[in-house]
Amino acid sequence: MTSLGLYIHIPFCRSRCDYCGFYSIGRKPTDRYIDALIKEMDLKSPDFEDRLCDTVYLGGGTPSSLSEAQLTRLMKALSQHFRISDAAEITMEMNPCDMSESYLKNAMRAGVNRISIGVQEKHDHLLSAIGRRHTAKEAETAVKRAYRMGFHNLSLDLMYELPGQTVKDFEASLRWAVHLPVNHMSIYSLILEDGTRMAQLAERGRLARPSEEESWAMYQAMCRILPAYGFERYEISSFARKGYRSRHNQKYWELSDYLGLGPAACSRIGRTRTENTPGVRLYEKELLTGHPPQQEVETLSDIDEMEEYCFLHLRMKEGLPLDGFRKRYGEDITHWYGDAVKMLKEKKLLKEDAGHLFLTYHGAALGNFVFEQFLQD
């Protein structure tokens, strides 16, 4: 039987970042919410009793907004309901402000062995501009403290194309980050999500963002600096030193099975994709009165899955295996995407080598355009 990934959504934040489009609410987690999560485990875990969970990911929101007691209780419940591998990668997203020595000790005792830290930038004026609560010094102290206490699988999130950010700012952030004791970085360009404060400012013409030339220079800096310090780009937004790829995120890109718990959490089992409806109060009410959470359910068609197979594999360093596509869908990729592949090769956005299709250097920079070519009308 294939392995299973677990995702647990902790949709609480002390304050909402100006760019964030994820479902979250501005208050501390309650014990009632942990009660509801455990009820969801009660309902769903029997269907997975023969599956070995080799990755667990606590995402948000801000999972480190959980109290030490709440985190301990949650992790204990997971181990009681699911078969967690002794070698499982257990990741928890943390805000630098929450990473006290006491909190880190408790997280380690609870089973967390990988921390993803939302750093975003090294310049305090830019952190303030995007609504982050921590300073660069607090982030650096938190990272070094976690490493000193035995967390050697640490990941940083960084962002570029921020309002007011210069190429020199981003280069300085990269050079600062590579000298921290981390082995993984996720680097994202700013996307203006509908309904966020930043999107509203942009609509009013009050958001000064880097030019296209500056954005391209930032992209080039990322691709130049990180490999020079041993960080391999193994996915379009992800860089890791050898042996430190995110095993949980690879499940998403490889179309593997994962189960999501919590409001707005997504699951994918085979070709069935489900999403719990957002709303903490509704989620708690349903589960604490003995009902499953309301869900949206979608069964992927052959075409839907084929599209995902193409653009998710193209995100990764290993690329899209042409023989794997043929075996999975019964036809060469040219049967479905011949014109698109030809056009993308001519534009030097795709290349073919050793039976795989890969994004080129420029193709990775224009990833969304490339991926759109694999969507059927």
Describe each model-derived feature in a short phrase.
Residues 331-343:
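Short amphipathic alpha-helical interaction segments
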Residues 345-355:
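A short, conserved structural fragment
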Residues 364-377:
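Short, amphipathic alpha-helical interaction segments positioned at domain boundaries
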Residues 356-360:
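Minor-groove-contacting beta-hairpin "wing" of winged helix-turn-helix DNA-binding domains
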Residues 8:
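Conserved N-terminal Rossmann-fold NAD(P)-binding element of oxidoreductases
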Residues 11-22:
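Local cysteine-cluster metal-coordination motifs and their immediate loop/turn environment
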